[in-house]
Amino acid sequence: MADSKTLLYSYQRLLEAEESRDIFQGLTEFEVMTAVAYDYFAHEELDYVIMEVGMGGRLDSTNVCQPVLTAITSIGLDHVALLGPDLASIAREKAGIIKPGIPLVLGKLEAEASQVIEGIAIQKQAPITAYDRDYQVELEASCLSGQSFSYHSSKREKAPYQVALLGHHQARNAALAISICDVLFDREGRELLSRELVDEALHQVVWPGRMEVVSQNPMILLDGAHNPHAVAPLIASLRELFPSQKKTILFTCIRTKALEEMLIQWQELENSRLILTSFEDPRAYSQEEIRAAAKKHQLEEVNWQEFLKN
C-alpha cells in the first residue's frame, strides 16, 4: 500500500512534467490518479500490476499501457449513456483493451457480448481463453466462510478450491483469476502455481463491500451492488445463504443507476423488508426523490444514520 508521501511525490513529478502543457485542464480525478498510479508502479519496479478499467475500456485512462495479458470478467447494462444502449455496444467498448497478439481471458459472458469480443480478439490475433470452453468451474457449497468450487482446464487437473468470499459469482471470479495466472505463467515459460498455493491465496482474499460480513450478531452484510447486473447475483446469494431468515435491506443508489428496475428486483426477494434511504452526494437522489420512490412502491424511507443507531 502506497503511503501519502510516496503518492505526493508521484503527483509532484506529474505536475512538473506537464507544467507547460496545461494538460490538467478538464481532467477528471480518476485520470489524474491513474497517471499517478502508473508513475508509482514504475518507480517501485513491480513485477506485475493489475489495472482495473474505470469505465468501458477503449477510451479509459488506464488503456495507455502495453499489457502482458488482458481480461474481461463480465458485462452488464451499466453506464449506457456513455457506452451504448445494449450488450453488444458495451462489449465493443470493453474490447478496446484487447491488444494484437496479447492473450485475452474471458469470464462468464452473455452470448451477445461474447460474440462481439471474440470477434475483435480474432481480428487482432489475440489468443482467447474462455469460460466454460477452455476452463470449467463446478460450484459446490456456500457458507458464511466462503464459496467452495472445483476448477479444471487443459493446463490444470480438476481439484477443489475455496475462496473466502460469498456468492457463486465469486467462485467464477476466482476461477478467472486462476486461469489468468496459468495463461500468464505458461506464456512466460514458468511453472504453474501449485494447487495448494492457489488455494491458500484464495482463502486469504478480502474484498470490502462485496457481501462483507461486518457483524455476526446481529448479522449485517455490506454490499456495493449498484446496477441490476450486480443486484441479481446478490439476491441469489442471499436466497441461498439465508433461505428462511427474515432479511432487512437498506438500499439506495445514485442518479445514473436504474433505481426502478432494482427496486422491482429487491421486492421479489422472499422474507425481506426493503427500506430506502438517501445520502449526501452531488450524484445521489435527493431525499424527496427517494421518498417519492418509496411512496410509489409502498416502501419505507429512513435516515440511514438513525436507522443504524436503532
Where are these regions (language model features)?
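Acidic-glycine-rich active-site phosphate/pyrophosphate-binding loop
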Residues: 7, 142-157
